[in-house]
């Protein structure tokens, strides 16, 4: 540490060894400080909702256009990086990208980790059997591990999934991801990883994650129809 920067110089700053540090006070204009405190205290979303109505329409539209362009560039850069990582495999890149978006922010990283760990060549051999796809997807996610489900909730179907995954795991020498990566707090039930994975099972089984089908969709309605996923019967009540 070579410099301590603060808003108010009210004490001597020292390192862990006791050495005094040079300090720099940066004065913040009162209106900026007030806006900062107001934004931090605001519980409504978005916090800036009081300010936006007072801005010129052209300013707001310009800001939104810039944000849209930045977001698209960010998404394109991520896809380019995935495409390089998969050595130009558009099918796998599409699957990973779709999975990441099923995480809806909170579980985006976990879903991407899961998709990167998903051997699509192995899954493809069992694609026509939705139960085997389900066992493979949930098993690779670590969600069939005993520690992830209370003993009283391990019903016959769950145990059957576990057994099937053990078979597939041995057959393809698989290693599941760390289930601790999944987040459940402050999520609505429909956004739980189990539900989103069950939807991925249905989409994959019905070949609606195929890159060729998605890019050949002619209309927004057709694309929405392809991505309109339901869950397998078991997960409708779990």
Where do the language-model regions lie?
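Hydrophobic, aromatic-lined core segments that form the binding pocket/scaffold
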Residues: 67-238
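Internal, well-ordered alpha/beta segment that forms a basic, Gly-enriched binding/recognition surface
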Residues: 4-123
């Amino acid at each position: 540490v070579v410099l301590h920067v603060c808003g108010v110089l009210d004490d001597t700053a020292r390192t862990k060894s006791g050495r005094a540090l040079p300090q720099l006070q940066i004065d913040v204009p009162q209106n900026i400080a007030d806006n900062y405190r107001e934004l931090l205290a605001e519980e409504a979303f978005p916090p800036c909702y009081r300010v936006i109505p007072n801005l010129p329409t052209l300013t707001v539209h310009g800001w939104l256009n810039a944000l849209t362009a930045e977001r698209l560039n960010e998404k394109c850069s991520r896809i380019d990086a995935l495409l390089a990582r998969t050595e130009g495999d558009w099918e796998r890149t599409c699957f990973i990208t779709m999975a990441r978006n099923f995480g809806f922010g909170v579980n985006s990283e976990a879903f991407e980790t899961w998709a990167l760990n998903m051997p699509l060549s192995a899954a493809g051999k069992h694609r026509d059997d939705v139960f085997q796809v389900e066992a493979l997807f949930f098993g690779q996610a670590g969600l069939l591990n005993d520690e992830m489900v209370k003993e009283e909730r391990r019903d016959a179907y769950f145990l059957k999934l576990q057994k099937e995954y053990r078979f597939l795991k041995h057959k393809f020498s698989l290693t599941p991801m760390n289930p601790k990566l999944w987040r459940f707090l402050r999520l609505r039930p429909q956004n739980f990883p189990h539900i989103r994975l069950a939807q991925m099972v249905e989409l994959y089984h019905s070949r609606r994650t195929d890159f060729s089908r998605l890019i050949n969709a002619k209309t927004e309605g057709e694309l929405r129809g392809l991505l309109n996923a339901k869950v397998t019967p078991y997960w409708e009540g779990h």
